[in-house]
Amino acid sequence: MMAFWKIFFKHHNIFSSNLNNQLVNQDAADKILLVKYLEGRGTIVNVYLSFNSYVNLHDLEKLCDSVGWVRRPLKKVKIAIDNSFVTASLFYEQNKKKFLIGFARATSDTSFNATIWDVVIHPDFQGQGLGKMLMAQIIKQLRYEDINTITLFADPQVVNFYKHLGFITDPDGVKGMFWYPL
């Protein structure tokens, strides 16, 4: 597993944001300027990062709809978020209203392992480094908590995105196994 971290940190320079040398206090992180003057939706916006676990579920559902994800029951989504170890949101503000443009969360045993879930960036804002910055902040929080094994599940079309961040398929060749009710 140490080989993974050597590869991961070899690629650390892809994470460029004004938070690179700071660790964010999750409890106090309601609104942190992440990117100034980003172009999106035909306008220039400031993008903010929040580690506040409160997320408007309808806004999150719209964000997930924008990338074609299957809808999930909002009650279960709320439970999943409430039971997450780390949540992070990206948004911009316009006319005193927040617009959710990115989200990710991680679950953990709080000791050894964490899994990153639900990484999503609105299509109007993809390709500008926001996904990389969001992942960098989630990983930074997990590493601060001394989590050594970070996993995620990725659809085939985004595997290369995660590979560019230093994630690798299991070096031991172990395949994940799943159980679903029939």
Curated annotation (Swiss-Prot):
- Give the enzyme class: transferase
The UniProt GO MF terms for this protein read:
N-acetyltransferase activity
For this record, the Gene Ontology CC terms, alphabetical, are:
chloroplast
Entry EC no(s): 2.3.1.-
Residues in a coiled coil are: none
* PROSITE patterns xrefs: GNAT (PS51186)
Superkingdom, natural source: Eukaryota
The entry's keywords: Acyltransferase, Chloroplast, Plastid, Transferase
* Cell compartment(s), UniProt: Plastid, Chloroplast
A Pfam family per the record? Acetyltransf_1
Q: Which InterPro entries match?
A: Acyl_CoA_acyltransferase, GNAT_dom, NSI-like
Every copy of the N-acetyltransferase domain together lies at: 55-182
What family, per the record?
Belongs to the acetyltransferase family. Ycf52 subfamily.
Protein name, entry field: Uncharacterized N-acetyltransferase ycf52
